[in-house]
Amino acid sequence: MFEGPVQDLIDELGKLPGIGPKSAQRIAFHLLSVEPPDIDRLTAVLNRIRDGVKFCEVCGNVSDADRCRICSDPRRDASLVCVVEEPKDVQAVERTREFRGRYHVLGGALDPLSGVGPDQLRIRELLNRIGERVDGVDVAEVIIATDPNTEGEATATYLVRMLRDIPGLTVTRIASGLPMGGDLEFADELTLGRALAGRRAMA
């Protein structure tokens, strides 16, 4: 254990995903060695994130405005909605350059063992969005692009059950080809692009 603020910094860094005790200690001592202006810039960025970053009121993606740039872009097809778990998954799909619709970010996946049920996800917002015709456009297709793991598949199955009886709505799931147990964000652009292009009807 180190003294005072050094240990406090290590403890806080260790709370970040993917950062273990050794990594937290290494980052902390790196920060202690850099010039004060570098620390000031990092502090300023963290303050801007705290004060200026919000979630899009339509899709739930991260944004610095009430609507993210994708939901604000009239060139995007509002009738086509790709459902993903996290904002990082939006970036993964965008890198494929294969999708010109809009997104809906659930904020996670169903995981009863961790206490994450339907009420903890943005499923009701998705249903409201389909029913309310955002920007005057009917949603014609929902593409379910949750991760190809147990939680993602459970979430996809639940969504199909909630969406399949909505008149005029097609529900599809991205095709196989992504490794089971993987995360969407780590899929290469070509594989993910093919999975989108080869999506299959679910309802």
Swiss-Prot record:
Domain Toprim: 79-179
Cystine connections: none
UniProt KW DNA repair keyword: yes
This protein's UniProt keywords: DNA damage, DNA recombination, DNA repair, Metal-binding, Zinc, Zinc-finger
GO terms (BP aspect): DNA recombination; DNA repair
Residue intervals of every C4-type zinc finger in the record: 56-71
An example molecular function term from Gene Ontology annotations: zinc ion binding
Alphabetized Pfam families for the sequence: RecR_C, RecR_HhH, RecR_ZnF, Toprim_4
Domain of life assignment: Bacteria
PANTHER family the record matches: RECOMBINATION PROTEIN RECR
Family: Belongs to the RecR family.
Biological role stated in the UniProt entry: May play a role in DNA repair. It seems to be involved in an RecBC-independent recombinational process of DNA repair. It may act with RecF and RecO.
Record-given protein name: Recombination protein RecR
Organism the protein comes from: Mycobacterium sp. (strain KMS)
Gene name of this polypeptide: recR
